[in-house]
C-alpha cells in the first residue's frame, strides 16, 4: 500500500521532517514487531481530534501498526539521539526502546510525532532490552490523559497493545507497546547532545528546525536564537506552575525529560501529592529529594541553564557576550514563575485582581496546610464549595484567622458570588488521578478487568466538573505505615 492509499484508509497524513536534520541526530531502524499482539486501549477521542479513522485503527489493521508489525509506507522509522543530565550527571542517551514512526499533519496544519514506546532494542539501548511492560504503559496512558483533562500541556497516548510476550523486570510482566503522540520529542538533552558531539552547523540546524517547528513567529528575526531561549524559558515557567497548582510531581526532571515544546513527557515515577508537603518525593531513586515537589521550579531553572549553555555559540560569537545574554535570559525564569504562580493561585482563591498583600495571603494558606497535613486538592475543593469537613486544618486557629482575611479580600473584589465560585471551580479540580486510584486501575487491568480503568478515564475527562457522580474519586487513600513509592517503569 502506498502512502496515499494508507492516508486515505487510516487518516494518517505522514511526513518525517526530522530526517532533514544531520544524521548524527537519529538512527534509521524498523521496530522488532510483536508475534501475538492484542489491542488493550485505543484512545478514540484523541484519534478523533487528530482526524484519524477510528474504525480502521481500532481493527487488526491498526493493531499491526501499534504493535510494530507494520510501518508507514515511504516513511523510515528512526530512533532519536540525545543526551541527558540524569540527577545532574551528564551522559549519552537516545531512544533505547522507542521509535519515531513519523509525523502526522492534521487538516489545520498541526504537526505531531507518532512514536512507538517499547518496540525493541535500538542502537542507543545500552544494556536495556528495548521492551516495556503493560502496567507502566497503561499508567502513562491514564496519567497523560488525566493531565490533558486538567488542561496541562502533555504528550498523549493513542494506543496500548500487549505484545504476547513476557518481559523481565523485578518479576515477569506482560510486554506492551505504547503509541505516544507529541508535538515533538526534541529535548533539552537533544541540544546538549548537539553541543557536546556535533559541529556548530549541527547545532544551528537543530535550532533552526526547532524554531521553524515550534516558534515560527521568530524564524526571521535577526535575534531569533535569543528569542528562542526566552520562549522556551517562558513555556517551562508556565508548565511548572500548572504542575504545582495541582500537586503533580514528575519525579525525574532530568534534561532528557524536558521537551522544548513545553509539554509534560515521560511519566516514569510521577505521582500526585495528597497531603500538602513541599518536601514530598515518591520516586524510589530520588534519595536526596532533588526532584521533590517544592524543588521542581529550581530544577526547571537548572535544566534551562543547561539549555542556555548548549545555545551559547548561537547567542553571540563572543563567548563572554553569549554568557551575559544567557544569564540575563535565565534570570527571567524566577520572575516569570513567580508572576504565573501567584496569578494562578489568585484564581484558585477566586480573586480576579492583584493586590499588594495577596502573596502573604497565599503563603499563609499553604503554610497552614503544610502544618496541619491538609490534602492539597480537597482543601481547595472545600474552599470552592465553602464547605468544611471535620479536618484538623479547618478547626485550627491559623485557618480561622486566614479565612477571615480571605473573606475580607473577596469583599474588596466586589464580585457576584457566582462569578467567584465559577472562577474557583474552573481552577480547582474536583478530582485528580490519585495514586491509589491509578494503582487500583492497574491492578485490575493486569487481571484483564478494565472496568475501573475505563470509568476512571471517563471521569478524568472532566476533572473540573463538581458532579456527585465523581465524588467517589475524591476519597483519600486509607492511612498506611508504608509510604507510596513510584518506579521508573515507563
Swiss-Prot record:
InterPro entries: SelO (IPR003846). Changing residue 220 to N: In strain: 8-6. Mg(2+) binds at residues 257, 266. Keywords: ATP-binding, Magnesium, Manganese, Metal-binding, Nucleotide-binding, Nucleotidyltransferase, Transferase. Its EC number is 2.7.7.-, 2.7.7.108. Pfam families: SelO (PF02696). Changing residue 171 to K: In strain: 8-6. The active site is at 256 (proton acceptor). One of its GO terms (molecular function) is AMPylase activity. ATP binds at residues 94, 96-97, 117, 129-130, 180, 187, 266. Its cofactor is Mg(2+); Mn(2+). Belongs to the SELO family. This is Protein nucleotidyltransferase YdiU. It comes from Clostridium perfringens (strain 13 / Type A). The lineage of its organism: Bacteria, Bacillati, Bacillota, Clostridia, Eubacteriales. The gene is ydiU.
